C-alpha cells in the first residue's frame, strides 16, 4: 500500500480518509470506485471525487475493498470456575482487527439464578473500557422464571439486545427442558427477538460422560466419545421442531457436524426460518486431534459441541456454507491457557471448553471456500459480514459499503499467504489450533470507525475506543416471513351444534394402565406401536430405527479418528 497526504495534519482532518483505485465488493455486486470517509461514516463513493484538503489517501492499487468482518460469536474475558479466558476485550478485539474483523458480538453468560440485567451491565463495563472495535451483546438465558421473563422484555425494549441463547446441554447447570424451550421461544417470538440455541442432548451426554469415566477414559478423547454427533443432530432437530411450533426464528450456534448441517439445510428447504452458524474451528480443522499423544495439544481442541473426528467434515461444512444452507460465521473464540485447561488433566469433563479463531476466521473461510472455488468474493462478504448484519438488525450501518454506512472497511489481498503460528498471532493464548496451517487471503489495511487500525501487518489499535452498538428487535431479514405466517396462522374453532347424545360414564372405565380385554397370561400378542415420521414437518435423513427391522441388542461401535465418514441419521 502507498499513502499520500500532508504530515502533521490537524486533528479535525485526521478522520478523513480516501481510498483510491479499489474494487468495492459487497454481497451483491463488485465495482471499481473511490471511497471518501469522514467522521466515521462513508460520505462519497464514485470516480473523481471532490474531497476537502488534508485528506489521507490510501492507494488500493486494484485490491478488493470489503466491509469489515462481523464475528457473531465470541467469549472474551469470560469467567469460568474462578478463572477468566486469557483474551480480554482488548486483547481479543485487537486480534479480531488483525484478521479483518471490525465488530464482534459477545455472549453475556449470567450465573444460574443471577439477574440478566446485572450481568449485561457487568459485560458492558468490561467491554466499554477495553474494546478497540465496535461490539454488541447476546444474552444467554441460564434459568427461566417470571422474573427472567420480565428482564428479557426490558433488555429487548430498553437495552439494545435482540438475541438470547438457551442451552439444551450442561445438565443441572444451564440445560432447559422442552417445556421451557417452548415457553422461551414463544416469548422471544412475540418480542421480535432471535432465539439462539446450543444444541446437544445434555441428558445423554451426562450418562455417556459417566460411562467413559467408568471405562477409565479420562483424557480429551473422552470429550468427543461422550458427545457423538448424533446428540448434536438430535438436539438440532428438536430445536427446529419446537421453534416451528412456536413460529419463532431459530439460530443454531456452533454447527459442528455433517448431520446437523444436513438437518438445517433440509429444514430451510422446507421453509423453516432457521439459521446455522459454523465456527472457525469447524470450518478449518477436525477432531482427530483429540487422540493426540500430547495431552496439552488434545485439550486445546476441547469445545462443545466437539469437532468431528471425521476429517472430511470441514470441507463438507464449507460446501454448505457456500451453497447458502449455512448463512453466517463466528469464531466462538474462548481461549484458556494450558495451565487452565489442565484442571481437567485427570477428568475430561473438567477441561475448560473453548478454542481460538477470532483472528483466523476470515482467512480460513477465504482459503477453504473462495480459493478452492466453492464460493465467490460476494458470498465471502455475505457469510463474514453482511448476513450477520442483516440477522441482528445492524444492516446497512454495518455489513455494507454504501454512503451513510459506518466506515468499517478492509483492503483484502486474495494472494497473500500467511502461516498460522502461536508465536505471531495476536491472541494471548500460547497455542493455536491452526498451528502451521498455510492460509491464502489476508487483510492489508483495516479501517474501523474511519481510523486505520492496521496497515501492512502493524496494528494501531487503541484500548477503549470500541462502541456498544444496540440491536433493535424485528429485523426484516428474519421476521418478514414470521409476520406473514402469524397472520395466516390464526386458529379458529369449528362452528358446530351442541352435542346432545349419550356420554360414557367414566366411573365404569378400567383403571389406567390396565388394557381393556387383556388378562394375565393372555396369549394375545400385543402389536408394538410404530411412530409415523411422515407426520412431522420434515424427516431425518437415512433409515430410522422403526424401519431397520431386527437390530443387534446393545452393541456399540466407537469410531476412531476418520471413522464415521458421513453420519446422516440418528439411528
UniProtKB/Swiss-Prot annotation:
InterPro entries this protein is in?
Amidohydro-rel (IPR006680), Hydantoinase/dihydroPyrase (IPR011778), Metal-dep_hydrolase_composite (IPR011059), Metal_Hydrolase (IPR032466), Metallo-dep_Hydrolases_sf (IPR050378)
Task: Note the Gene3D superfamilies from the entry.
Answer: Metal-dependent hydrolases, Urease, subunit C, domain 1
Tissue specificity remark: Expressed in the prospective neuroectoderm at the end of gastrulation. During open neural plate stages, expressed broadly throughout the anterior neural plate and in the three bilateral stripes of the posterior neural plate where primary neurons arise. At tadpole stages, expression is maintained throughout the central nervous system and in the eye retina.
SUPFAM superfamilies referenced in this protein's UniProt entry, alphabetically = Composite domain of metallo-dependent hydrolases (SSF51338), Metallo-dependent hydrolases (SSF51556)
Which controlled-vocabulary keywords does the entry list? Cell projection, Cytoplasm
**NCBIfam families according to UniProt:** D-hydantoinase
* Membership in a protein family: Belongs to the metallo-dependent hydrolases superfamily. Hydantoinase/dihydropyrimidinase family.
> What protein name does the entry list?
Dihydropyrimidinase-related protein 3-B
**Lineage of the source organism?**
Eukaryota, Metazoa, Chordata, Craniata, Vertebrata
Amino acid at each position: 500500500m502507498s499513502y499520500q497526504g500532508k504530515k502533521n495534519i490537524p486533528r479535525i482532518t485526521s478522520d478523513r480518509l480516501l481510498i483510491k483505485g479499489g474494487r468495492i465488493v459487497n454481497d451483491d455486486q463488485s465495482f471499481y470506485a473511490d471511497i471518501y470517509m469522514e467522521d466515521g461514516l462513508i460520505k462519497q463513493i464514485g470516480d473523481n471525487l471532490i474531497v476537502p484538503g488534508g485528506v489521507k489517501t490510501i492507494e488500493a492499487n486494484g485490491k478488493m475493498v470489503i466491509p469489515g468482518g462481523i464475528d457473531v460469536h465470541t467469549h472474551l474475558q469470560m469467567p469460568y470456575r474462578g478463572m477468566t479466558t486469557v483474551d480480554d476485550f482488548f486483547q481479543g478485539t485487537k486480534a479480531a482487527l488483525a484478521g479483518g474483523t471490525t465488530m464482534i458480538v459477545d455472549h453475556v453468560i449470567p450465573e444460574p439464578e443471577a439477574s440478566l440485567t446485572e450481568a449485561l451491565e457487568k459485560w458492558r463495563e468490561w467491554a466499554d473500557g477495553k474494546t478497540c472495535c465496535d461490539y454488541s451483546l447476546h444474552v444467554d438465558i441460564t434459568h427461566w422464571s417470571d422474573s427472567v421473563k420480565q428482564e428479557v422484555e426490558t433488555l429487548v425494549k430498553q437495552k439494545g439486545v435482540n438475541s438470547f441463547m438457551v442451552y439444551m446441554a450442561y445438565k443441572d447447570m444451564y440445560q432447559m427442558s422442552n417445556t421451557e424451550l417452548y415457553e422461551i421461544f414463544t416469548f422471544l417470538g412475540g418480542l421480535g427477538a432471535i432465539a439462539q440455541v446450543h444444541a446437544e442432548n445434555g441428558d445423554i451426554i451426562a450418562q455417556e460422560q459417566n460411562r467413559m469415566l467408568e471405562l477409565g477414559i479420562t483424557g480429551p478423547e473422552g470429550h468427543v466419545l461422550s458427545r457423538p454427533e448424533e446428540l448434536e443432530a438430535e438436539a438440532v432437530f428438536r430445536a427446529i421442531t419446537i421453534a416451528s411450533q412456536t413460529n419463532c426464528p431459530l439460530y443454531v450456534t456452533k454447527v459442528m457436524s455433517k448431520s446437523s448441517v444436513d438437518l438445517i439445510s433440509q429444514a430451510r428447504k422446507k421453509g423453516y426460518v432457521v439459521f446455522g452458524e459454523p465456527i472457525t474451528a469447524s470450518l478449518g480443522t477436525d477432531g482427530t486431534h483429540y487422540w493426540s499423544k500430547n495431552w496439552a495439544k488434545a485439550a486445546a481442541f476441547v469445545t462443545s459441541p466437539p469437532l468431528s473426528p471425521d476429517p472430511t467434515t470441514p470441507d463438507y461444512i464449507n460446501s454448505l456454507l457456500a451453497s447458502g444452507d449455512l448463512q453466517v460465521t463466528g469464531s466462538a473464540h474462548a481461549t484458556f491457557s494450558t495451565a487452565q485447561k489442565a484442571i481437567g488433566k485427570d477428568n475430561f469433563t473438567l477441561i475448560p471448553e473453548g478454542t481460538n479463531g477470532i483472528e483466523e476466521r476470515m482467512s480460513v473461510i477465504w482459503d477453504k471456500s473462495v480459493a478452492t472455488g466453492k464460493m465467490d468474493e460476494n458470498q465471502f462478504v455475505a457469510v463474514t459480514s453482511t448476513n450477520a448484519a442483516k440477522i441482528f438488525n445492524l444492516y446497512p450501518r454495518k455489513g455494507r459499503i454504501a454512503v451513510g454506512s459506518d466506515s468499517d472497511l478492509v483492503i483484502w489481498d486474495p494472494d497473500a499467504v500467511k502461516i498460522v503460528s502461536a508465536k505471531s498471532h495476536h491472541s494471548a493464548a500460547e497455542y493455536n489450533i491452526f498451528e502451521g496451517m498455510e492460509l491464502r487471503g489476508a487483510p492489508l489495511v483495516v479501517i474501523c470507525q474511519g481510523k486505520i487500525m492496521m496497515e501492512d501487518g502493524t496494528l494501531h489499535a487503541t484500548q477503549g475506543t470500541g462502541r456498544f452498538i444496540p440491536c433493535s428487535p424485528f429485523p426484516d431479514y428474519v421476521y418478514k416471513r414470521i409476520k406473514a405466517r402469524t397472520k395466516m396462522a390464526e386458529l379458529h374453532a369449528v362452528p358446530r351444534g351442541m352435542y346432545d347424545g349419550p356420554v360414557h360414564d367414566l366411573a365404569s372405565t378400567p383403571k389406567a394402565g390396565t388394557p381393556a380385554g387383556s388378562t394375565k397370561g393372555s396369549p394375545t400378542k400385543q402389536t408394538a406401536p410404530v411412530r409415523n415420521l411422515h407426520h412431522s414437518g420434515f424427516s431425518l435423513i437415512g433409515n430410522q430405527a422403526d424401519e431397520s427391522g431386527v437390530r443387534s441388542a446393545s452393541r456399540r461401535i466407537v469410531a476412531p479418528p476418520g471413522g464415521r465418514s458421513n453420519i446422516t441419521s440418528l439411528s
